[in-house]
From Swiss-Prot:
Cellular localization per UniProt: Cytoplasm
Protein name as annotated: Ribosomal RNA large subunit methyltransferase E
Annotated S-adenosyl-L-methionine binding sites: G46, W48, D63, D79, D102
PANTHER family: RIBOSOMAL RNA METHYLTRANSFERASE (PTHR10920), RRNA METHYLTRANSFERASE 2, MITOCHONDRIAL (PTHR10920:SF18)
Listed Gene3D superfamilies: Vaccinia Virus protein VP39
Pfam families in alphabetical order: FtsJ
Species of the source: Wolbachia pipientis wMel
Active site residues of this protein: K142 (proton acceptor)
Principal location listed in the UniProt entry: cytoplasm
SUPFAM superfamilies assigned to the protein according to its UniProt record, in alphabetical order: S-adenosyl-L-methionine-dependent methyltransferases (SSF53335)
Catalyzed reactions per annotation: uridine(2552) in 23S rRNA + S-adenosyl-L-methionine = 2'-O-methyluridine(2552) in 23S rRNA + S-adenosyl-L-homocysteine + H(+)
Amino acid sequence: MNDQYVQKTSKDGYRSRSAYKLVEMDNKFKLFQEGQKIIDLGASPGGWSQVASQKGANVVALDIKPMNAINGVEFIQCDIINEFEILREKFKDQKFDVILSDMAPESCGLKSLDHIRIMLLCEAALNFAKHFLSHGGTFVVKIFQGESDKDFCNELKKMFKTVKYFKPKSSRSESTEMYLVSLGFIGSKPSI
C-alpha cells in the first residue's frame, strides 16, 4: 500500500495509522496533560491509547473487539451500548478528563447508510460522555460528513464551550471522515 502513514506506523511503533490523526489533534488543540484520566472508545487496535498513554495519561480503553495489551493502559472488552449499565456500575461516580471516540461501523459501502450508522455510534459516545466526562473536559468524536452531522454539532455546542470540526492531514483525502473536537464540557443531562 502506498500510504505514507501506514508505512510510518511500523517505523514509529504505532499500531495504526489513526495514531497520527490524534497526534495532529493534540498538536492543534492541546488535548492531553500528564496525569489525566482518559477513556478511549473504539480503542482497538490501540493507536489512540498509545498516543494518550505516551502523553502521560491514565487510559482506559474500551472496544467490542479484542486488543493486545499496551503498557499502562487498562483494556475492557465490551459493547458500550449493550453493556452500558455494567460500565456505569464499574465506573460508578468516576469522571474522566478526556473521552475519545474513534468508533466506526463496518462500512457497507452506501455512504448514506454508513453515515446513519456512525451517527448512532456518535450518540452512544455522547451519552457515555454525559455520564462520565468531568466538568471542563474534552470530547473528541469521529463523524462521517452527511445530513445529520450539523445537528449533532449543534447538540454539542449546547454542552461545550468550544466545538470545532477537524480533518487531519493523515485522514485519507477521499474519506468523509472528520472529527468534532469539543472543549470545556459545561454539562448536560444523560439520556439514560
